Each structure stands twice: as structure tokens, then as C-alpha cells.
Amino acid sequence: MLMRHAIAPGSGDLPGFGLEDCSTQRVLSEAGRAQSSAIGARLRTHGIASARVLSSAWCRCKETAELLGRGAVAIEPVLNSFFADRPTTEAQTAALRGLLRDWIEPRPLVLAICQVNITGLIGIFLVSGELLLV
């Protein structure tokens, strides 16, 4: 499952942001937090009690993934946004395709990522909090 992070007002990254400091990043709004929790509940309703949950290192993606409540969240660098580093688009998207192609675990895989990565992978635009089964 590809999931765009939940509602985080704005777009792109703030000037001078740091991955280790959420106070320098766009983060989920209260509506985004509620959205993430509601999506997690909906996944449970549809029989997904647990999953392998991977996230980019961006705080809005990590928090989205954590609030789903479907399992421990692991940071996967190939999921990191390339919004400010467009020359890496092709290589990073190829690596993401490889991750999906090589997935062999029986439990579902949930990827919490940014829009630019989703568009690079499948060529469509998901709204905040939208999920896509692949």
C-alpha cells in the first residue's frame, strides 16, 4: 500500500529544514493526526490488524505511519522525498520499484511517503492521507 502522508499544511520543505528536527519541517496538523488515526482504524476494519510499515525520514510521514497503529515503523531511505533533489528521481524511483518487486513477507506492506515519490513511481497525484493498493 502506498500512502501519502496525512494533512500537513503547505508544500515542499521549509528553508533550512533538518530531518532530525521536526520543528524545522512541515508537520501534521491536528486534522492530519485525526486523519491518520481514522485511516488506521479503517485498515483494522478491513482486516489489516498489523503490517510491515515503512516510512521516509520526514516527520510528517513518520507521524502518519505511527498513528496508523499497524506496527512498528521503520525508516527506509529509498522512501525519502526527492522534492529538493530532482536529479535523484530516476535512481530513487528504480530502487523503490525494486523494494516493491522483492517484497516477500506474507503481511501487508504500508509505505508512508511524500507525493513526489508517488508521482515518480506511478504518475498520479494522491491527496493527503490517500492510500493506493499496488
Regions found by a protein language model. Name each.
Residues 1-77, 82-86, 94, 124-132:
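Active-site-proximal alpha-helix that buttresses catalytic centers in soluble enzyme cores
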Residues 91-93, 98:
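Internal catalytic-core helix/loop-beta-alpha segment
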Residues 98-134:
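Active-site-adjacent alpha-helix immediately C-terminal to a catalytic or transition-state-stabilizing loop
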